[in-house]
Amino acid sequence: MTPQQVGAYRQLLIDTIQEKNLQGFYPPQRLDHVLQGMANEVPGKLQRLTHEWSVPMEVATDVMKLSLFDVILYVDDSGSIEFEERGVRKDQLRQIIGIVATAASTFDEDGISVRFMNSMEMGDGIRNAEDVDMLVSRVRFQGLTPLGTNLRNKVLDPMVVGPARTGRLNKPVLVITITDGQPAGEPHDAVADSIRYSIDEVSRSRYGRGAVSFQFTQVGNDTRARDFLSALDEDPMIGNLIDCTSSKYYFLHFFFLSTSEPS
């Protein structure tokens, strides 16, 4: 990799650190260490992604920014995923998990963590589609959609807020929620309340506001789910803290295009 390429990639990561308020995690020495770890592999890996995913280089480049984060997928495993639209939703869900796992593992061998809304099954170090298929095959899709309640119980408290309070958060966390419907079996504002709670908690920690980010991705074509995610996206209190999309490959791109300012 040429010095010019190293400089360009370094600036790309610096811009992301500033835009996403990650300075508490990445002083200059640590950023240099991150770059050294991926140095000679970047051009070839980016070319491979553009070919395999049929996306422009700017979208593939966003994958490199993902190396700054620990990625947690929070997955809706309610009954409608299995039975609505003749199983299409479950296929889409499996595909998205595979895309995220591949993307996150391209420049960081740790892989991603997966937590399910209802099932006690879980996965860590998930790196590719094969890992995803093995994990999803163990999950029984059933029940309602207590999306916000278990977002806090299964993801935010044990994996974000708890470690932030005790100074054990190694990287900022990107929580990607995959769902097919609006929440059910919990208070209407449970999702928004869980997000606000986690933002408040990490903001009081030494890591600051950038310690957690949220992405919501819809599978299926349920209009109520679309309306719910749109309402989250436009919420005056948290809309600038999250990003919602139904795009398959571009959702990571949209996340990195968004800024910390209200839209």
Could you tell me what each predicted segment is?
Residues M1-S263:
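Acidic, low-complexity intrinsically disordered regions
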